[in-house]
Each structure stands twice: as structure tokens, then as C-alpha cells.
Amino acid sequence: MDPRSLHAWRTTRRDLLRLTGASIAAVVGTSLSGAHAQTAYPTRPLRLVVPYPPGGPTDTAARIIGAALSERLKQPVIIDNKPGASGSIGIEQVVRSAPDGLTLGVLANPTLMSPLLGVRQNFDVQHGSTAIGMAYEIPLVLMVNEKALPGVTNVRELVAAAKAAMSAGKPLSYATPGVGSFSHLITESMQSLTGVEFAHISYKGSAPAIADVLAGHVPIMFSDMIAALPHVKAGKLRALAVASAARVAFTPDVPTLKEQGFDLQANSWGGIVAAPGTPAPIVERLSTELKVVLADAGVKEKMLAAGCLATWSTPAQFQQHLVSDYARWGKVIQERRIKPD
């Protein structure tokens, strides 16, 4: 080989080896950096935004989950109550936070449905956040005041009583925590299913609504289990049915709506979301830890005591749930012509 050609070949070979080594080092370095970032997360305390006041069902569930996540992540999980606009104010703070997985939020069904009821949101409630996963469900129970409706012991008897009251021109009334609440929407769905019409009495929250049902001023209410359970257990209100797919541990003797011939089911729910653009490794870590936490026997027991069912789903499943529930209840709101207060 010509000396000049030999020199050129050696130079090219040396340069190729140098470039190959640098490329390998870069790939390895990137992989190690990514692995380190995943294992290092989180390096600071997390904030879990609860977009409702302290003491409610979402707040109760969030505090149980937050405490368990803190143990798993080895960092404090600080509960930050930011109520307002059916939860939209708090979730907007999450959506506009840095996508580092350090600010999380509890997105519950009232917030999902609020734009359907005229609440203005500055974000896309269906797609504007990063879904981490479903966290809990709260069974709904259909209950009546026994003194107001003494002969009603199941849903068929309630429907019969309602039809008789309609024929007499005095429809039975039902209480809800407010227009567009889950209690309101499922009762409207039941009316469509059965052909009965109740008179809606709207209150500002579960407490005053249940108080009037206890007093007999309003005989009927679909309530979340957290608010209803003490009165059902005390025998002050009669539980006719649960709206979940299966009977619940709190009231094992109370049949589902479907068991009684009414194909209607729905639970109130809440899930964990993060800011849009949160890196996939962080989402995966949070989803995995949430799954472990919700499977823990101690967490399940605490959730049950609070009237909640620990319910995990993948990020993709929770995202799909947001889309399907928005469509389902949006149809009810439209068909029943439900208007905001």
C-alpha cells in the first residue's frame, strides 16, 4: 500500500474508533442519567392538591393515600386544600405547575362535569392533565325516610309509590347536595329509566340535605356512603339499594339496583393527576406506588372506615374513564335539561 494511503487509512480508522467510543459513552451516559433521575425521584416533598374543603370525602381519601404514599416515596406528601368552582380552581393549579411530579391533584367527578354545568375552566378537564390513576370510589346509596314512606322497603316499591304520587298530582320529592351533583345526576338517570318523576329539592351540600331527609321533610335521597352510613347504621334511614356494580362491605345486606331489576350503576370517584408533560418514568413510578398503596390491607381498612373503596387503575384506564364519564353524564345533563343554579 502507498505510504500516504496507509496513513490516511490509519487516520480514518482511528477517527471512527474515537467516534464510536464517544457515541457509546453518550448512550450509556444518557441511560445512566435517566436511570438515576428515575431512582432519585422524588428529591423534595410533594404537594397533593385537594380541590375541596377539609373534611369531605375527597379530602378524607386524599389524606389516607397521601400518608401511605409518603412512606413509599420517602418524602412528605403535603395536603393542600384549594376549594372553589367545583374543584376547578385547585386542578388548574396542578395543570399550571411544573411537570416534575412534585405537584399532584385529586381530580373527582364534580370537577370533570362542572364545565357541562356552566363552570368556566381555563384548562381541558378531559385531556389537560397527566393521568396517574384512579384512587378511590365512593358507593352511592338510595335511602328513604321510613316514617315518610313506611311501606317502601325496596326500589320496586319506591317506583310504585312514586307513580301513585304522580297520579295524585303530588310527586315525591328528593334531596341532593346541589344541582349537577352526582346525587342529582344519578336520580335523574333513574327517573329516565323508570318513567317516574320526582320533585327535585336542591341544597348547598350533603349535610343540610340529609338533615331534611332525617326530619322527613324530603323522603328520598341518593347519597354518598360517607354521609349516609352513620344514619343507615343507626336505623334512622332505610337503605334501599347501592348503585355500585356489586354489594359493598359497609352494607352487605343492601342489594344493588341491578339485583332489583334496574340496570343502573355509578360510583362517585377520584383519581390522581399531575401536570401535562410529566415525564413517563415519573408517571410510571407514581402509578406503581399508588397501586402498591391501594392494595395494602391497612390502607383498604382505613378507606372502608371512611366510606371509600380503594380502587386502582392504570394511567391509560383513568384517562379513558375521564372521557367516557364526561360523555355519559353530559348526555344525561342534556337529555334531562339540567341547568346550573
Language model features: what each stretch is:
Residues 1-15, 19-30, 36:
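N-terminal secretory signal peptides
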Residues 37-127, 170-171, 179, 195-219, ...:
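N-terminal (or domain-start) structured segment
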Residues 43-45, 192-196, 233, 256, ...:
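An extracytoplasmic/periplasmic, membrane-proximal ligand-sensing/linker region
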Residues 46-48, 55, 62, 79, ...:
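Residue-level signal for nonpolar/aromatic packing positions in well-ordered secondary structure
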Residues 62, 66, 91, 155, ...:
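Extracytoplasmic/secreted envelope proteins and their assembly/folding machinery
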Residues 96-102, 116-208, 269-302:
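Hinge/capping helix and adjacent helix->loop/strand transition within the periplasmic-binding protein
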Residues 126, 137-138, 228-295, 324-327:
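C-terminal lobe and pocket-closing loops
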Residues 169-253:
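Ligand-binding pocket segment of bilobal, Venus flytrap-like solute-binding proteins
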